[in-house]
């Protein structure tokens, strides 16, 4: 009896790509990161991973999975290729006045501020946090510690450099651009770099949120974990939220993304603003 071969997900592709290939990618990514890829992401997966196949000169996704199993270092590159890195300076702008108010209150108590940006991507979020604190506290040497982490080592390298195309700064007020960025010239024309004083306020680390040890000390004043939870299933969301809330001070703030809500976790957090929560 003849056996049928899996049909490609899309026609006329450079690499043969089946539903089985996509399901295997979904399973591997979930196992490594806890991220649940939606069925609608099949084309995105092909686009991202086909670059790896070309670079490695592999002929099929089956060959790539074999390579993935044989080369431990490829797992991180696999994760880097598939994790989404959509970000912007002062994204979800309504969060930053609340952070500034929190900073001023803590300064009055003579208490240093500790903040974790848990999905830092290419750095726009932690640098927006740093700018907010410098502006609120009136000093380039504020009593703050900002830890910024991501699972993707590639974006963290970009974040540490702090170099961005000028168009990324288009929506930023001119005084902030002038104070916190250096405009490139010559071969760096069309780019801007975060000033060194601001870069020194942020410590970048590679952290997989599914790891048992985050190496993040407690008593945090704020955690930014925005537009991350949507990639996890509800049980994983609850486990992560429980761990993060345990790191916050009682008056600390948890900043979530615009498409996230934690109605299912009201025993852990209470809403104190638009997508802003405190420990319950």
From Swiss-Prot:
Residues 10-280 form the CheR-type methyltransferase domain. Its EC number is 2.1.1.80. It comes from the Bacteria. Pfam families: CheR, CheR_N. One of its GO terms (biological process) is methylation. One of its GO terms (molecular function) is protein methyltransferase activity. SUPFAM superfamilies: Chemotaxis receptor methyltransferase CheR, N-terminal domain, S-adenosyl-L-methionine-dependent methyltransferases. It catalyses: L-glutamyl-[protein] + S-adenosyl-L-methionine = [protein]-L-glutamate 5-O-methyl ester + S-adenosyl-L-homocysteine. GO terms for cellular component: methyl accepting chemotaxis protein complex. InterPro entries: Bact_Chemotaxis_MeTrfase, Chemotaxis_MeTrfase_CheR, CheR_C, CheR_MeTrfase, CheR_N, CheR_N_sf, SAM-dependent_MTases_sf. CDD domains: AdoMet_MTases. Keywords: Methyltransferase, S-adenosyl-L-methionine, Transferase. The keyword Cell inner membrane does not apply. S-adenosyl-L-methionine binds at residues 85, 87, 91, 125, 150, 208-209, 226-227. Methylation of the methyl-accepting chemotaxis proteins (MCP) to form gamma-glutamyl methyl ester residues in MCP. It specifically targets the McpB chemoreceptor. Interacts with the C-terminal pentapeptide GWEEF of the methyl-accepting chemotaxis protein McpB. This is Chemotaxis protein methyltransferase 2. It comes from Pseudomonas aeruginosa (strain ATCC 15692 / DSM 22644 / CIP 104116 / JCM 14847 / LMG 12228 / 1C / PRS 101 / PAO1).
């Amino acid at each position: 009896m003849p056996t049928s071969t899996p049909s490609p997900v899309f026609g006329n592709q450079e690499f043969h790509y089946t539903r089985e290939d996509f399901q295997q990618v979904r399973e591997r990514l979930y196992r490594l990161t806890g991220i649940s890829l939606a069925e609608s992401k099949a084309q995105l997966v092909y686009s991202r991973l086909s670059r790896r196949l070309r670079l490695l000169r592999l002929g099929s996704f089956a060959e790539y999975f074999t390579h993935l199993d044989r080369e431990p270092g490829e797992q991180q590159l696999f994760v880097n290729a598939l994790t989404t890195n959509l970000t912007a300076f002062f994204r979800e702008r309504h969060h930053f006045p609340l952070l500034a108010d929190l900073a001023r209150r803590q300064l009055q108590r003579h208490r240093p501020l500790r903040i974790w940006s848990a999905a830092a991507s290419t750095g726009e979020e932690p640098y927006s946090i740093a700018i907010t604190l410098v502006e609120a506290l009136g000093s380039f040497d504020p009593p703050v510690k900002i830890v910024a982490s991501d699972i993707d080592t590639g974006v963290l390298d970009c974040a540490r450099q702090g170099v961005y195309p000028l168009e990324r700064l288009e929506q930023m007020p001119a005084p902030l651009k002038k104070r916190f960025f250096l405009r490139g010239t010559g071969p760096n024309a069309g780019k801007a770099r975060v000033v060194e004083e601001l870069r020194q306020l942020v410590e970048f680390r590679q952290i997989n949120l599914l790891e048992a040890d985050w190496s993040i000390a407690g008593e945090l004043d704020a955690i930014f974990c925005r537009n991350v939870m949507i990639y996890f299933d509800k049980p994983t969301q609850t486990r992560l939220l429980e761990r993060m809330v345990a790191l916050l001070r009682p008056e600390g703030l948890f900043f979530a993304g615009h498409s996230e809500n934690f109605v299912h976790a009201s025993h852990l957090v209470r809403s104190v603003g638009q997508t802003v929560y405190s420990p319950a």
